[in-house]
Regions:
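Histidine-/acidic-rich catalytic cores in large beta-rich domains
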Residues: 1-172
Length: 172
């Protein structure tokens, strides 16, 4: 995922990824750096991870998109400047769950969280908690139950919907 340039020469992006044996596209932490390379903001406290043979640590588990408050698209738009030194951040994350209503297999569940400048999670919206609202008919639910797009990571996990993007809504 490419980093995003913010006003004033600030850059936001991932500092690295979790080992692929244990996670699929799990960003370790989302950081913002200034022009001189100093970290001015960091988020990594979504999930506490203890992978075998690795250091126990907190991770963002951020696979794809993120948006800083003020700019819903992530690139320059006149009058919609992201807030480089303040504001909330919307982050697409995922976590490993067991939900027998969706599948009898382990699942990689996508979610959206909003984090304040201090790294506090203000709210979370998880796909698995709203699965019945997505409008899948019984045939589609049956397919997802039997094969939720299994991946080798994490001992076999179903990447059942694989969300890539989310965004703040701009002015209507």
């Amino acid at each position: 995922l490419p980093p995003k340039l913010l006003p004033g020469g600030y850059v936001m992006g991932l500092s690295g990824y979790r080992h692929p044996d244990y996670g699929m596209q799990d960003g370790v932490n989302l950081i913002e750096i200034d022009y001189d390379g100093n970290i001015v903001w960091e988020f990594d406290n979504f999930e506490n991870i203890d992978d075998p043979g690795r250091d126990h640590r907190w991770m963002a588990r951020q696979p794809h998109n993120y948006q800083r408050e003020g700019n819903p698209v992530g690139s320059y738009v006149p009058g919609m400047d992201a807030k480089p030194l303040s504001g909330n951040t919307l982050i697409l994350v995922h976590q490993t769950i067991h939900n027998p209503k969706i599948s009898d297999k382990k699942l990689l569940d996508d979610a959206m969280i909003e984090v304040d400048w201090d790294g506090n999670i203000l709210w979370k919206w998880s796909i698995s908690e709203h699965f019945d609202e997505l409008g899948f008919d019984e045939a589609a639910k049956n397919v997802l139950f039997r094969d939720p797009n299994l991946r080798a990571s994490d001992g076999g996990v179903g990447d059942y919907l694989h969300v890539n993007c989310m965004s703040y809504l701009g002015p209507n």
